[in-house]
A protein has these predicted regions:
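Non-cysteine beta-strand/loop elements that form the S-adenosyl-L-methionine
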Residues: 5-9, 101-108, 160-166
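Conserved, mostly hydrophobic/aromatic
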Residues: 7, 49, 64, 77, ...
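Active-site mouth loops of central-metabolism enzymes
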Residues: 22-30, 52, 78-84, 110-117
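Catalytic beta/alpha-barrel core
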Residues: 54, 80-82, 105-108, 118, ...
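Catalytic pocket-lining loop regions of alpha/beta-barrel enzymes
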Residues: 116-166
Length: 166
């Protein structure tokens, strides 16, 4: 059986791009790259990890896929695409059905509308995501759980995973 760290971030730290890393998380205010992690994973009996986006940009998704292509222990990438965009299909196709792209995540917890998941343009995006056989990582706070129940009921074939930091 393979043991995988299912949620790992990589970044070259820049305070302007990672404003969410506040004073309470100051230990994260440094670079985190694959070469910093691989030996730790091995030492602790892990075979690899899933790299998860920390910035909501297509460039971040491309960069994580490049890292995954260079480091075999990165078994997959949960990236970002604009699930509300009329260009969503083109964004997804631009990754060429890369086998390392295993899922998509939108930082719902930062959206001011607590019912963001139920917006029509977002629902259309999730329906498109389903066609590409990618998981959807639902990053929320506890207060969003009632909406998540409604959301997942609409997509019974869509594989989803809840990220609940609180």
């Amino acid at each position: 059986m393979m043991h995988i760290d299912s949620h790992q971030h990589f970044w070259k730290y820049d305070a302007r791009e990672y404003g969410w890393i506040d004073e309470s998380m100051k230990s994260l205010r440094r670079d985190f790259m694959p070469e910093h992690l691989e030996s730790e994973l091995k030492r602790n009996g892990f075979d690899g990890c899933i790299a998860v986006q920390a910035r909501q940009t297509l460039e971040e998704t491309r960069w994580l896929l490049e890292l995954a292509g260079r480091h075999a222990f990165i078994k997959g990438v949960v990236g970002w695409v604009d699930l509300r965009s009329p260009e969503l299909r083109l964004q997804l196709e631009s990754f060429g059905r890369n086998p390392k792209l295993v899922g998509i995540r939108h930082i719902v917890q930062s959206e001011p509308d607590h019912r963001f998941l139920m917006r029509p343009e977002f629902l259309r995006g999730i329906a498109t995501l389903e066609e590409f056989n990618l998981t959807y990582d639902i990053l929320i706070y506890t207060r969003h759980l009632p909406v998540v129940s409604e959301f997942v009921a609409r997509f019974d074939r869509q594989r989803s995973r809840i990220d609940l930091p609180d």
